[in-house]
Each structure stands twice: as C-alpha cells, then as structure tokens.
Amino acid sequence: INKAIKESKIPGAVLWIEKDNSSYHQQYGKMCLTPAPKSMQRDTIFDAASLTKVMATAPSIMLLVEEGKLSINDQVTKHLPKFKGVQKNKITIKQLLTHTSGLPPVLPLKPEWKGYEQAINLCYSADIRNTPGRHFRYSDVNYIILGEIVKRTSGLSLKSFSQKKIFVPLGMKDTGFTPKKTKIHRIAPTTKEKGKLIHGVVHDPTARAMGGVAGHAGLFTTADDLAKFCRMIINDGFGADKKIFKKQTIEVMTKNQTSMFLHKVRRGLGWDIDSKYSSPRGDGFPKLESFGHTGG
C-alpha cells in the first residue's frame, strides 16, 4: 500500500486483515488530495461501487428465496412481466446472478436519460447478445434488474430492504445508499468529472442517473462495516450474535453455479470463484477454495 501511494497509484487506503480471532485495521495516506490534502481515517466512508452487487443485491434476493417469495430458477418475466422477448422469456434469476443471461454489460448513456424508471425501461428494451445460459459476461444490467425484482417482490426499495434485513441487524451503521450530507466530511471523493469532484454521490454514471440507488452500484461503506459483512458470510450467515442467513444459503451462494463452462469460469450467486476478475486474490487464497468480488 505504501508503495502504491509513493508511486501515486492511489492517494490512500484503509486495510482490514482478519484471521481466526486476530485482526489488523489501519489507515494509510490521504483520503483526498484535492482541493486540499486530507488524511485518511480508519472510519473513512468509501463508494463501494460493484461491491453493491454482493453486499446488497444478491443477498437481498437470497433472503427473498429464504422467505419463499421467489426461486433462483424463476424466469424473470414471472416477477417483471414487461421483461419479455423471444430469448428474454428464458432468462432466469440464477442467470442474472451468475452473469450468464446474455444481456449487455451496461445501459446506454446516450441519448441522455435520467430517473430510476427510465433505467428499468431501458433494461426491458435491452437486446440479448447471447443465448441465455451459454456465455459469461459481467453485466451491470443483470443487477439493475435484480434490484427491481427485490423492489417488486418485497414492496421495499433495495435501499430499504437491504438496510432493514442486512445492514442494521449486522450493526453496519455507516453502510447504505445515498449517504447523508452530515457524513460528507468522512466520505472519500472518487474522481473529477467535467472539472467537478465527485464527492458524497455515487461515482457510477448509471447509478447516479438512477438517483443513487441501483442493484449494480451505489452503496457506501467503511472497512469496519465491510469486515462485519464478510465475517457473517464466512461464519455461515451468523453475525452480530444473530442469524442473518441460513447456512445452506451461504453454501449455495459461494458454490460454483456455472459448471456448464467446465473450467473456464466459476461463479457463485454474485460471488466470483475463478474468472478473469479473480487476479486480486494473489497467492494467499486457494484457487478453488476461496471466493470474493472486485467488479468487472
């Protein structure tokens, strides 16, 4: 981390390493360099970007599975009747979770659009690129649709559902969508766009156009809160002295669900097991015995 900071690859970072009952939590460098340098803090809040998929969206879907409100083998049209077409009618929730739906990677930003419902309509009209179940393509569109399924099935927005069912029970007090302005001093900016610093709002342009709440991006969190979430996953769904998920649910989420691709791609339900996106795991995590997520 210090080397990356010295080489100006990153301004700073917060590191959490945990094994058994020991943990290491430390901040490094700066949380921002402009308009004025500001030191990184252990409780700095970050734009979690694509971690939204595995911290909010996929877990919310699986909680609805536990509640008997849907099945991962359901066709998407069962829950979103407007999502239809010759090939689209075949797409299942599982294929959305594993990025094997055949849908495009992103929604078009041109011509310019704005609003959550507009994004959902663009998902409805998106063209299929491959036969569902035949090809792996990391896709934000998959998770935008999953976020809408959470909303339609539960009656709550993804923001409210994940807060109520996951983040509050785990004591993740600094995790959520659309952070309050009172926390702006703790939030690390991301980058500049058209000369303006992106700070306190989601960096992803599609999620921003949707109002900050989307299934693929938009979540903000801290290293401390992320550790609480990961600890719960590792402990078979048990965290903060309560059961968040059934053990079987965690096993299904972290098991290879794309065996049809033989050894080329291994994906769980949301989680990455072995694909071209797995390289950050380094040498410390066994290739087929670990899982994680970075993005695409």
Question: Each PLM stretch: what is its role?
Answer:
Residues 1, 21, 45-73, 143-151, ...:
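Active-site SXXK
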Residues 1-48, 69-71, 118-121, 126, ...:
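Short, conserved catalytic-motif segment at the N-terminal edge
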Residues 12-14, 75, 135, 176:
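Residues at or immediately flanking beta-strands
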Residues 25, 32, 86-290:
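Short, surface-exposed loop or secondary-structure junction motifs
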Residues 59-65, 80, 97-104:
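Generic hydrophobic/packing signal
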Residues 72-86, 168-170:
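Short, glycine/proline-biased beta-turn/loop segments that scaffold the active-site neighborhood
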Residues 292-296:
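Flexible, Gly/Pro-enriched loop and linker segments at secondary-structure and domain junctions
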